[in-house]
Amino acid sequence: MRLFFVIIVTSFSISCGNNSLLKEVKQLDYPSASGIEYFNRQYYIIGDDANDLLVLDSNFNPIDSIQLYSFTEKRIPKAVKADLEAITITKDNKLLLIGSGSLSPYRNIAWLIDPVTKQKDSIRLDTFYQRLTLYGIKELNIEGACAIPGSIILCNRGSKGYPKNQLILTSENFWKDQANVPISTILTGSATDSTVFNGISGLAYANKSDRLIVTVSTEDTRNNMDDGAIGKSYLWIIKNITSKKNWKTLNPDQVIDLEAIDPKFKGQKIESVCITKETKNFLYLVLVADNDNGSSSIFKMITEKK
């Protein structure tokens, strides 16, 4: 079992005009956090070039890890990494980890993991990813996933060279019948400035209010492979998402500029979000950031529903 140290950077509470509150920030000695999920009061974090799935308790303390790969390097080389970017909980309480698909065959992979028994199975997604190119996705770069009633939503991140974010809707167990499962896509967010592109990086679903929570980051890259200079990060909130599954395009109902909440978000490339609690008026969120230097950060925040 491998454990990873957590370095506490700061813990504070401030209020701001947009009714969001940053509660806590911690730095993780874990490479390239790209996805986070919350289940049974534990956090499960994947890194796009990490050998292990990291497990934290409810206070962000490392308590376990699940080995997926056995490279000697702390960070798997870019040319062969699986680029696991998305994580979600399936309807039968399994963790589904999904590779980006941006470099075949290495990144056309998924893992299905039982968080209780730690049983894990690897899944090839070649057939499913080949089909996605028939649905108008020019450059494949799967960055997030979440389960909604009756479906799974994936997000494909665009770039300055391919400025299109797309939500992909498919069946709950899409990997079991990849040649035949239904697929539909929704162009999400409008690109109005050619000098910057806001790329979707993660998804979470608030089931009580039927909201899709989307993490978005800006990065100066013109393709689906390379990293670039890190810009600002945002949360997009899309209301009534289950009633919009057949839409062809949609824009967020609410945009939250994270750097405007607190300067601790400056220079942080937010990669993913999970929901720990939802009340009538508030969403309790935890986000992770990958800073492209082999370290990661985790943020706890509250945002008011609007």
Give, region by region, the residue ranges found by the protein language model:
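Sequence/structural signature of beta-propeller domains
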Residues: 17-306
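Bacterial Sec-dependent N-terminal signal peptides
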Residues: 1-23
